């Protein structure tokens, strides 16, 4: 029986604040040794979003290095942010979105929380793999709003889930 050929991965990563904000709360992890590529976006407007996104990836990578599965590693990141926000006044409410892909040969696992997205880019098309945990996406899902309306809606940046949010 022949073994599947290893998948060659070529990647590049860049994170910019954009044209609206002057401060970037993103963190990136590109770890081919773990088969992991991840982005965490600290909660803009919340206390210490850059701390939350960095902590999310630190915990995610650490858990995977210890042999945890991706889902368990994401949960560890969530708990770490929730715990870090508790003892320090002014940090309550800090949180982060997360999108992570883990490759194993020619298969992959995908995890996400919030509205950071994962796409599969092929030679013929681009396919969104994740599904936003956002207020506007929930409205689209139940037919109360079109995707076009969601792109312009004043609540388009309201997310329903994030790492560090108590009660998830």
How should these model regions be labeled?
Residues 1-168:
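PP2C/PPM-type serine/threonine phosphatase catalytic domain
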């Amino acid at each position: 029986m022949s073994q599947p050929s290893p998948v060659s991965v070529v990647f590049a990563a860049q994170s910019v604040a954009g044209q609206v904000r002057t401060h970037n709360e993103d963190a990136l992890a590109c770890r081919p040794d773990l088969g992991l590529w991840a982005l965490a976006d600290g909660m803009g407007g919340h206390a210490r979003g850059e701390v939350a996104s960095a902590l999310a990836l630190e915990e995610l990578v650490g858990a995977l290095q210890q042999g945890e599965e991706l889902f368990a590693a994401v949960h560890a990141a969530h708990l770490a942010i929730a715990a870090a926000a508790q003892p320090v006044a002014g940090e309550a409410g800090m949180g982060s979105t997360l999108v992570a892909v883990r490759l194993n040969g020619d298969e992959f696992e995908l995890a996400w929380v919030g509205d950071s997205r994962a796409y599969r880019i092929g030679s013929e098309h681009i396919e969104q793999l994740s599904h936003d945990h956002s207020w506007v996406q929930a409205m689209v899902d139940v037919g109360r709003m079109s995707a076009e309306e969601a792109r312009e809606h004043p609540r388009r940046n309201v997310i329903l889930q994030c790492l560090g949010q108590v009660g998830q």
